[in-house]
């Protein structure tokens, strides 16, 4: 019976826009067993991909509203589902595995969970989640790399931050997972920046607006790629990603998933006359899009994700970030609902 509830949960997760593809080894079931108790799996599998009032859910699962709310709130504290409250009424929905349940597993991330995640991603999980479009995340450029008159409103990371009311930092689940399997990353662990839209997010450490702005500068300085949810409005976080740990960038560098992240509407160019061949840009590029030819750096535009780290770090200004021509610009979905609808359509699913 307990195995059956995990099968039900896996199927429910795969019907969400993000997807939770099955594998030939069934490692995804072991993964769910590690994270959810049988009761939690049963409850989660009976939720939908839309926010519903607790009364509706309670009737469906055969519990009183009070008992259902107590159990669901406790699950929400551990990131096992999504929760919202309007006035005195509670709403819940099934959370995607990625981005959702997985990112909330910082406290439970141990050697076993880390290896299960790695096996799942490497054996079809990453491809099944990252290949469907629109992508989960999109790249936004380093602030110092783009002239203000060229930056698009939804690509302005500082403007996104300043429109929020509260701020927090938390550890990066990707680096935490990689550390457990023996990969030591040189970048800091606490690099995920959260805004007011996700103020209930577990494991977040509250910081001030000034600290958040300073952190964005620091992330760019040390060479981390800004990525956000692939929407124009309602952005709740900025991930600061490295190519060795970040799942979506590893999609490009390790698993051959070229569209695992939506590229920024910019591309890097390096002036061969100005380049002194110091290699700083090659070291800062997280997706290996820059190589050396005849003593100078050259950008492979097909690989360039437009993050601008080469331009912001070039000691003599040889590397620059340019906006793509108008016919190459790609606008992200307006909001999360539009993103979900487009993704469901592209996966041949409906709500």
Regions found by a protein language model. Name each.
Residues 50-61:
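Short acidic, hydrophobic short linear motifs in intrinsically disordered regions
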Residues 76-87, 290-291, 319-320:
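A short, conserved structural fragment
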Residues 124-267:
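Catalytic cores of enzyme domains
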Residues 301-351:
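Flanking helices and flexible, charged tails adjoining ferredoxin-like Fe-S electron-transfer domains
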